[in-house]
From Swiss-Prot:
One Gene Ontology CC term in the entry: nuclear speck
Chief location category: nucleus
GO biological process: regulation of circadian rhythm; regulation of DNA-templated transcription
The name this protein goes by in its record: Paraspeckle component 1
Species this protein is from: Danio rerio (Zebrafish)
PANTHER family on file: RNA RECOGNITION MOTIF-CONTAINING (PTHR23189)
Composition skew (Polar residues), residue ranges: 1-29, 46-55, 464-474
Length: 512
């Protein structure tokens, strides 16, 4: 059973095959040679079949595609001229049906030409070779490759530029169909290339940008130069059948090609034409040499300037880094100063907190002291106050008269000293104890030289009987005179003006 995806195509070649061949296009399995390419030849046992049946061949159209080749490009576009005026679009498509899919079909019936685009360049070449000169409506058609209006020529290319790099560089302006670096017969780059875009706007954009700016393909500051490609037909050329048979044609074609004989008119002017061509050649060579020398000089200057530029960039980079380091050092110093200030502030705050804590702790210690210590402290304070008052009263009462009867007969109450509940008496020189009278007058035996004070002794001959009056703290005053029977032989040693010198009201006992 035949494959429904295969198409029957007829390829005629009278020089090789005397009979018509049917070529079928396959798109299903290009990898299987049995399915993609079959040649059904006539059987050797039946020689008559070779004359009666045409040869059939199944051809995969993908075999006509080069590796990496793009399809339906401008290079696959054919120009068809001398078409009949009544040519329909469907008939025009059927003309190229056996060569695969076709796109961009255009016909201008008024002027008798059209365009069609096939899948690959190879198929377009096959169609051109087979259909060129085919008679349609008593008119032979002419088929040529259409002019590529979006092709650009690139000059001043570096020797390290490849086809891929060239395509990558110009892809920014639009889709690139083909990019080729032209090389000589030894494969060395000539510094020229061709870039073919898919449409004219992309080519125009590339021309404008490269004319206004400088497109660099490598690190070398060597810009590429773009210009429209000059279209030449170096394949078909100009056949004899296409020449117009004018009067000039017949005049020039009277003589066959021949060499001019020396000494003739033809030889003289032929020599002058050759001399002009030689001068043109020499001038072109001289210009090329001058241009080459200028290029080499520019290359040398460019290398020197490049090194100088690199050194300058290194200096600038070094200065920038030094400036950055200096700025970082300043920032670091400022940060250190800020840290020192913060540390000093924290230290001051810590010291204040410690002082506050110590002060608070002392207050807590004072509040937590026992009651006995507090009462003793208060009594010592009261005793100091009494001593101060006693010194003041003694100084005032030095010249006053003292009534011994009142001092003796008055009721004497006990005086509390230093938090003690017992009576405090004074021992006289005879060993009898004397108490402080109730009238608040201190007997002079307290400061006598006879003996120390004694506690618990009776006052004025009494035997230590408690006074019925309540105990009261009276200020002790120093008397001026001596009382017989109560005081000793000597009175005030220091406070009396008689017994000794008077030190004044500021004479106080030391606290400790």
């Amino acid at each position: 059973m035949a494959n429904p995806n295969l198409k029957q195509v007829n390829i005629q070649n009278n020089a090789t095959f005397p009979h018509q061949q049917n070529v079928t296009r396959s798109t299903e399995s290009p990898g299987d040679p049995k399915e993609t390419m079959e040649a059904v030849a006539p059987s050797p046992q039946d020689p008559s079949s070779a004359n009666s049946e045409p040869q059939e061949m199944t051809v995969d159209i993908k075999n006509f595609r080069r590796p990496g080749e793009k399809t339906f490009t401008q290079r696959c576009r054919l120009f068809v001229g001398n078409l009949p005026s009544d040519m329909a679009d469907e008939d025009f498509k059927k003309l190229f049906f056996k060569y695969g899919d076709a796109k961009e079909v255009f016909i201008n019936r008024d002027r008798g030409f059209g365009f069609i685009r096939l899948e690959t360049r190879t198929l377009a070449e096959i169609a051109k070779a087979e259909l060129d000169g085919t008679v349609l409506g008593n008119r032979p058609i002419r088929i040529r490759f259409a002019t590529h209006g979006a092709a650009l020529t690139v000059r001043n290319l570096s020797p390290v530029v490849s086809n891929e790099l060239l395509e990558q560089a110009f892809s920014q302006f639009g889709p690139v169909e083909r990019a080729i670096v032209i090389v000589d017969d030894r494969g060395r780059p000539t510094g020229k290339g061709i870039v073919e875009f898919a449409n004219k706007p992309a080519a125009r954009k590339a021309l404008d940008h490269c004319a206004d700016g400088a497109l660099l393909l490598t690190t070398s500051p060597r810009p590429v130069i773009l210009e429209p490609t000059e279209q030449y037909d170096d394949e078909d050329g100009l056949p004899e059948k296409l020449l117009q048979k004018s009067a000039q044609y017949h005049k020039e074609r009277e003589h066959k090609p021949h060499f001019a004989q020396p000494g003739t008119f033809e030889f003289e002017y032929s020599s002058r034409w050759k001399a002009l061509d030689e001068m043109d050649k020499q001038q072109r060579e001289q210009v090329e040499r001058n241009i080459q020398e200028a290029k080499e000089k520019l290359e040398t200057e460019m290398e020197a300037a490049k090194q100088e530029h690199q050194l300058m960039m290194m200096r600038q980079d070094l200065m920038r880094r030094q400036e950055e380091l200096r700025r970082l050092e300043e920032l670091r110093n400022q940060e250190l100063q800020k840290r020192k200030q913060i540390e000093l502030r924290h230290e001051e705050e810590r010291r204040r907190r410690e002082e506050d804590m110590i002060r608070h702790r002392e207050q807590l210690d004072i509040r937590r002291q026992p009651d006995g210590f507090k009462s003793g402290f208060m009594e010592s304070r009261e005793q100091d106050m009494r001593m101060n008052e006693m010194g003041t009263r003694g100084a005032i009462n030095i010249g006053d008269s003292f009534n011994p009867v009142t001092a003796i007969s008055g009721n004497q109450g006990p005086t509390q000293m230093m938090g003690m509940g017992g009576r405090v008496g004074a021992m006289g020189p005879d060993g009898s104890s004397k108490m402080i009278p109730d009238n608040g007058v201190m007997p002079n035996e307290r400061f006598s030289e006879g003996g120390p004070l004694q506690m618990g002794s009776p006052v004025g001959g009494q035997t230590g009987v408690d006074s019925p009056q309540p105990q009261q703290h009276s200020p002790m005053l120093v008397g001026a005179g001596s009382v017989p029977g109560v005081l000793g032989q000597s009175g005030f040693g220091r406070g009396s003006p008689v017994g000794g010198s008077f030190d004044g009201p500021n004479n106080k006992r030391r606290r400790y």
